[in-house]
Amino acid sequence: GELLDSYYMNQYTTQQYTDRVNEYYNTLCSKVDIWEIGNEINGEWLGNTTDVVAKMTSAYNIIKSHNAKTAITLYYNYNCWSNPQNEMFRWAIQNIPANMKSGLDYVWVSYYEDDCNNYQPNWQRMMDSLHTIFPNSKLGIGECGTSIVSQKTQYMQRYYKMNITTPNFKGGYFWRSNRRDCSTSI
């Protein structure tokens, strides 16, 4: 269950986010298996890093206190960030506490080639690097897609056919606009 899309994170104080986490958990705990405690958590649009880390950590502690599964989604932004402090690996190493690095159940990556100068990552190397930081977490692609209509089929084929052998890599490949893009009208 996504607690809050990254787009809205900067509209919540830490207390409001904490209240939201508690409310969502108490309402939906019987229906949600995995709780996404931070969506595109290193995104430059989320607000002050100190506040973002406080929100993420609070959510993690709340969900883990119920022995529930946690996930975090990182925004892959190789060479397309405004502030180098927000580069995905750098941000994760510097801002995610050690107990979360060893305790997160899932770590997902959000990536849109359109956002990053059409860069196509070496996914094997990238997932291997993530596994080093999060050795106990299951890894995957939490969001991908494109707004370029003529490229959607090509992108889908590329992402869904990836063969990544990193330990604990589970796949994912959650195409952001799947319902719309995969309908028979396309």
What is each residue range found by the language model?
Residues G1, V32-N39, I72-Y76, N86-W123, ...:
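Aromatic- and acid-rich polysaccharide-binding/catalytic face
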Residues G1-C80:
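Substrate-binding cleft and catalytic face of glycoside hydrolase catalytic domains
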Residues D5-Q15, N42-T50, Y75-F89, Y112-W123, ...:
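Acidic-and-aromatic substrate-binding clefts and catalytic sites of carbohydrate-active enzymes
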Residues T13-T27, N83-A98, Q154-N163:
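Short, acidic/polar
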Residues Q15, K31, K64-K69, K101, ...:
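Surface-exposed charge patches in extracellular/virion surface proteins
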Residues D19, E23, T57-S58, N117, ...:
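Extracytoplasmic low-complexity repetitive segments enriched in small/polar residues
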Residues E23-K31, S65, A92-S102, M127-F134, ...:
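Acidic (Asp/Glu)-rich catalytic clusters
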Residues Y112, S137-I186:
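Substrate-binding cleft of secreted/luminal carbohydrate-active enzymes
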